[in-house]
A protein has these predicted regions:
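Short acidic helix/loop segment immediately C-terminal to the autophosphorylated histidine
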Residues: 10, 14-21
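Conserved catalytic submotifs in the C-terminal HATPase_c
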Residues: 59, 79, 84-94
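Short conserved segment of the HATPase_c
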Residues: 140-152
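Short alpha-helical segment of the dimerization/phosphotransfer core of two-component systems
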Residues: 30-37
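Short helix-loop "hinge" at the ATP-lid/N-box region of the Bergerat-fold HATPase_c
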Residues: 112-114
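Short alpha-helical Gxxx[C/S/T] motif in the catalytic ATP-binding
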Residues: 165, 169
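Conserved micro-motifs of the catalytic ATP-binding
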Residues: 52-57, 94-98
């Protein structure tokens, strides 16, 4: 893609030993901006594909297993910020859906719980037969539940965040006839996916 070509050219330029520190710093800022644009582009493309119903291949999935698999991938990052993660599997949440969309749904909620958490905080995940709830520590005020699932909405601006993660999760849930809701309870931000 043109963005990948630009990124590669920029990376090659950054390897030039004749660059001054100031020039290298400016190139690094440009590289960060390009990374953000690439991430934004991927998210918008995914939303468009979801909206156009382009994910037709489905299969029976056990969301518990997918969740545990991706939790392992994030383990090191959570440890770095000293965020304690617990998962309470009360039952198995089975669903028939596209596996890529299931992964996007779960990873967006995991990323959200991490990005909007505090150092030394926690993430508690509860899985039942009909729901998965992500609870995380974070800012001590509820978020605007009227706008939280809107595209580009950001309750608290985080560097590198596109403001599309929860909009993607919401679109996937609507496509799969699941519901997603946000609530604030006992100083925890809670996102619950459930069957309609």
């Amino acid at each position: 893609t043109p963005l990948a070509i630009c990124r590669n050219r920029l990376e090659m330029l950054m390897e030039d030993d004749s660059l001054s520190e100031k020039q290298l710093e400016e190139l690094m800022k440009t590289h960060q901006t390009l990374e953000y644009i690439t991430k934004l582009n991927k998210s918008l493309l995914l939303l468009t594909k979801i909206d156009n119903g382009q994910f037709t291949d489905t299969k029976q999935l056990e969301l518990n297993e997918l969740l545990k698999q991706y939790l392992q991938d994030y383990e090191e990052v959570y440890d770095y910020r000293n965020i304690e993660v617990t998962i309470d599997e009360q039952d198995i949440f089975n669903v028939t859906m596209n596996e890529s969309l299931a992964v996007a749904l779960l990873t967006n909620l995991l990323k959200n719980a991490f990005v909007h958490n505090i150092d030394g905080g926690h993430i508690r995940i509860t899985v039942t037969k009909n729901s998965i709830t992500f609870r995380n520590s974070g800012v001590e005020n509820p978020l605007d539940k009227e706008h939280i699932f809107e595209r580009f909405y950001q309750g608290t601006k985080k560097e590198g965040s596109t403001g599309l993660g929860l909009a993607i999760a919401d679109s996937i849930c609507r496509l799969q006839h699941l519901s997603i809701r946000y609530y604030f309870e006992q100083k925890e931000h809670c996102f619950e996916i459930s069957r309609q």
